[in-house]
């Protein structure tokens, strides 16, 4: 099969024109709003969830159990959801691969839809909790907490 023995069913040439329609302005004096959650840093989330985020795939099971237990004990009162975010990364990663994982996790931890975040590490992974914490920069210490399972009694 090649271009000599195949044929297209397309005929002619279609011209495309982009004609955007202007959006009418809101009448003055009418303010727009939505029900959201303002965070201390000024960002606004549309959800108020508790996120349990592992720094390494080795603690995925623990993060699931922590989220399940929290859902059972609180009945989800006052929050939209309690969610664990498992992944298979953070251990034995190097270079750009390791940095990309850290950036994705950082962006999740700092996301305004998370009203509270528990970052869970193992303690021996490449993506160490201490170094990851430094990567967050200035963060709300009341909203974001850390746990290393190898250091917990």
Q: What do the predicted segments below correspond to?
A:
Residues 1-153:
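Metallocofactor- and cofactor-centric catalytic cores in central/energy metabolism, strongly enriched
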